């Protein structure tokens, strides 16, 4: 049941946490058919299930290896940093992106990755339900993220809607990401 004591049918607490799946591309067979191997357990992803609604795969720390961010619904986000040996280490809390600036979880859904302030570091924008403000985490030195939603005035946004997806781009063609 939910926090209000009523039974939930579709809420995040109504289902067990899901284990994300990771498949490694092993190349192609003789007839050009691609083959994949399930490396979920060996990679370390299986040890951290969650109600992920959004995902972004990107080299967040600039080491040349792809990392994985999960926007989790009403639970702390997960950030798996590639250890360059086939394994990932969950570091969302350590890097400041598990919770918002108030230490709370949100109905995290859509994920957009962008260098919003042109400092060479990738930032993460996450959308939520209509009753919540979307969140922008800016990356700082040593790969630490901070919730910059309020300081950047995004908590005063005039648009309020459920955001199941997010796309970051230079929509007005002025050389800066929007």
Tell me what each language-model feature is.
Residues 1-178:
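Acidic, glycine/proline-rich Ca2+-coordinating loop motifs
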């Amino acid at each position: 049941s939910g926090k209000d004591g009523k039974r939930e049918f579709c809420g995040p607490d109504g289902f067990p946490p899901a284990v994300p799946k990771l498949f490694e591309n092993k190349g192609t067979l003789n007839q050009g058919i691609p083959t994949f191997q399930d490396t979920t357990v060996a990679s370390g992803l299986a040890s951290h299930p969650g109600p992920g609604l959004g995902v972004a795969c990107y080299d967040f720390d600039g080491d040349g290896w792809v990392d994985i961010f999960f926007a989790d619904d009403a639970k702390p986000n997960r950030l798996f940093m590639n250890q360059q040996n086939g394994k990932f280490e969950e570091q969302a809390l350590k890097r400041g992106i598990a919770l918002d600036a108030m230490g709370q979880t949100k109905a995290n859904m859509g994920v957009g990755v962008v260098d919003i302030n042109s400092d060479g570091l990738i930032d993460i924008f996450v959308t939520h339900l209509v009753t919540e403000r979307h969140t922008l985490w800016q990356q700082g030195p040593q790969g630490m993220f901070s919730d910059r939603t309020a300081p950047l005035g995004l908590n005063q946004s005039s648009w309020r809607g459920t955001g199941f997806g997010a796309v970051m781009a230079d929509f007005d063609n002025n050389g800066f990401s929007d």
